[in-house]
Each structure stands twice: as structure tokens, then as C-alpha cells.
């Protein structure tokens, strides 16, 4: 059952980004409504990843504004943007190669934990129950992405296409309001999105 397209959830207005004398983005505007799918399409070097990096708080544009759910931000870091409900995948993978698929996807749940890091590390008190609930959420994502057979495999041992699915799983684990996908299907022969 498809959901009805809703109100504007992300509004990007007049974004310009320069690196020294090189213009990466010039006066870019668009919006995304709730339950809507949008694509930024262009050749290599057109600035697609730079645009996502501006929305995600990795880059700070010199001009323009980004409004998410009615809150305009210009100088927010990636963590603040994630706390607002924006998640993303990366063109160049940024996974923990020595950690398992399950543990990599669990990192996407980090902001959802209420207990302190110390309580989590000790599995003490409510932290143990909380981790069980977070793992159940991640297990549903692993099932959805059809990567059950690789659950305990270190990510560095997986082919690129499967690593892209793990990256998507980590972003989905954040349970985001907006999901930014940078080259989501690169290296994957099976469509999962």
C-alpha cells in the first residue's frame, strides 16, 4: 500500500558551494515531500555527492538554505542532522571492515539508545534490554536486505555490492525521516530498493 504524498519535509534553496575557485554547486533549489522519492541525476563530477554532503552537514554551503521539517539550518554537523532524522549512504563506503555485518548495521542505531555508553558496554540494567530491542530492529533490516547468510561475516570480506547493502542497512537502521542514497545500486546486481 503506497502512502499519500505529504507536505514538504526537505526544502533546499539556492545552494552554492565552492572549493577555492571551483564551483561545485551553483544556485541549486529543490524540495522533497513526505513519502516522495526524488533523484539527483547527472554525469560524474556534476556535484551530486556534494549536494548530499551539504544536506548531511559534511559540507557547509557558502550560499542558500536547507530547511528540514520547518527548521532551517546552515551550520549543523552530521550528528545534528542525523538527530533530526536524516540518514545517508555513501558513494565511497565508510564501513568498519573488521566488524560483522550485524555490528556495522547496529552502529546506525547508536542515536536510538537511551542508556549511557558505560551501561551499554557493561550490558548493565536497562541497557541489556535496550540492546535486545535494537538488535531485533536490525535483524528485520538484515532480513529485508536478504543478507542473513552474512550476518556474522566481517564486512571487509564481502564483495562490493554486498558492502553497499550493509551501508544501506546502516542508514535504514537510523529509521530516518529522509534517506539520502549516494550511488545506492553501484556494484549490486540485485535490486533491493
PLM features per residue range, with description:
Residues 118-154:
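Conserved ABC ATPase "signature" region
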Residues 175:
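Conserved catalytic motifs of ABC-family nucleotide-binding domains
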Residues 41-43:
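The feature captures the beta-strand-to-loop junction immediately N-terminal to the Walker
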Amino acid at each position: 500500500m503506497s502512502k499519500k504524498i505529504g507536505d514538504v519535509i526537505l526544502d533546499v534553496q539556492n545552494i552554492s558551494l565552492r572549493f577555492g575557485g571551483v564551483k561545485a554547486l551553483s544556485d541549486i533549489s529543490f524540495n522533497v515531500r513526505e513519502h516522495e522519492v526524488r533523484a539527483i541525476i547527472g554525469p560524474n563530477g556534476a556535484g551530486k555527492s556534494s549536494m548530499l554532503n551539504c544536506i548531511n552537514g559534511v559540507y557547509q554551503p557558502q550560499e542558500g538554505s536547507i530547511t528540514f521539517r520547518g527548521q532551517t539550518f546552515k551550520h549543523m554537523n552530521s550528528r545534528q542532522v542525523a538527530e533530526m532524522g536524516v540518514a545517508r549512504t555513501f558513494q565511497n563506503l565508510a564501513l568498519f571492515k573488521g566488524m560483522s555485518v550485524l555490528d556495522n548495521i547496529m552502529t546506525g542505531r547508536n542515536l536510538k539508545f537511551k542508556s549511557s555508553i558505560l551501561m551499554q558496554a557493561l550490558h548493565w540494567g536497562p541497557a541489556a534490554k535496550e540492546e535486545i530491542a535494537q538488535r531485533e530492529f536490525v535483524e528485520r533490516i538484515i532480513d529485508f536486505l536478504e543478507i542473513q547468510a552474512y550476518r556474522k561475516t566481517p564486512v571487509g570480506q564481502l564483495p562490493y555490492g554486498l558492502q553497499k547493502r550493509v551501508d544501506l542497512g546502516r542508514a535504514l537502521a537510523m529509521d530516518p525521516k529522509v534517506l539520502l542514497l549516494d550511488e545506492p545500486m553501484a556494484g549490486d546486481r540485485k535490486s533491493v530498493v
